[in-house]
Amino acid sequence: MAKRVTGPEIEKLIQLLAKVPGLGPRSARRAALHLIKKKDQLLGPLSHAMGEAYDKVKICSRCGNVDTVDPCTVCTDGHRDQSVIIVVEDVADLWALERAAAMNAAYHVLGGVLSPLDGVGPDDLNIRGLIQRVGEGGVREIIIAVNATVEGQTTAHYITDQLAGLEVKITRLAHGVPVGGELDYLDEGTLTAALRARTAI
């Protein structure tokens, strides 16, 4: 058994950092050591920022985004096209689409995907909120932007079925050849999706 070389406070910091996605035990130790070495420049301000986030962060009651105000900044942005809603699995997907700056639409965060094996059903996701938003009127298009996994496709089909009968256009992100990708390196599933989603030139 390895000997302890730090106090319990530092060990706790390392253990908590190791729970952050992308950080394993070794990376967490390095991060903790770096924070401690830069106590005034990093550890103090980080501790303060985390305390503020803990106190102020909330989930938007309209779209499911994470913000310090409710409704969130995206929902209250008067320059956005609120008639187009992009449906995403998670807040990280919303942020990724915003970085791409390809559309100035509204969003709806599901909070995951349908996964019967993991016990995740429709009531565990924010699907009812989406149906309510569409039912209120003013929405002309729903863009389903979930991951191209079996669970993602199942979720997309379920949402499409639930929105049937409402006057709204339903589209999904195209799947296939990435920009700069070479056909020889793509798997069969990706090539099949690309062929099926082909567009006119």
From Swiss-Prot:
UniProt key word Metal-binding: yes
A GO biological-process term: DNA repair
Zinc fingers (C4-type), renumbered ranges: 60-75
Molecular functions (GO terms): DNA binding; zinc ion binding
Pfam families documented for this protein: RecR_C, RecR_HhH, RecR_ZnF, Toprim_4
Domain spans labelled Toprim: 83-178
Record's keyword terms, sorted: DNA damage, DNA recombination, DNA repair, Metal-binding, Zinc, Zinc-finger
Gene3D superfamilies to which the protein is assigned, alphabetical: 3.40.1360.10, 6.10.250.240, RecR Domain 1
PANTHER family per the UniProt record, alphabetical: RECOMBINATION PROTEIN RECR
HAMAP family with a match to the protein in the record: RecR
Family (UniProt): Belongs to the RecR family.
Function: May play a role in DNA repair. It seems to be involved in an RecBC-independent recombinational process of DNA repair. It may act with RecF and RecO.
Entry protein name: Recombination protein RecR
Organism per entry: Rhizobium rhizogenes (strain K84 / ATCC BAA-868)
Taxonomic lineage: Bacteria, Pseudomonadati, Pseudomonadota, Alphaproteobacteria, Hyphomicrobiales
Gene designation: recR
